[in-house]
């Protein structure tokens, strides 16, 4: 499916509870905040819309500014303790009225190593509004993932931190090479990390 029919949804509202006191999305990786790697890669593609679900601006002012500069519509999840499902629900509620959107590409801000080529593979494997296309490391299904419009009602009923895992496990699986699906949950997951000073 052409990216022009897809809304990219960047999930960046987690509480980073396992990362300690620092905001993991602001941890420096290769010279810039970790989240910047994902938001810039996704913004460089021709999606119908760029949507980011984030914490309130007082908790993540730098991320808000970077997203705004790159043209994202910012949706605030003021209850991040509800888990990833709450963020997905907010994004789907926003997208549903636009019938030109055939599906969403769910991306995680704590997966900084996913290249544009992989996002493209996910989108190209999506055929229509019934499609579900997930990434896999050969063991489990995960984002980045395409979820077609037909499944939006199911997404609106999600609860908790498992997100759309059950739905993704039944979709087309795009296997990755290397460690590109590595997500950062603790400081140890990010070699040489250091907190960034807010602008």
Question: Language-model segments: what does each one mean?
Answer:
Residues 2-141, 170-177:
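Nucleotide and nucleotide-moiety/phosphate-recognizing core
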Residues 16, 27, 152-153, 191:
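Nucleotide phosphate-binding site architecture
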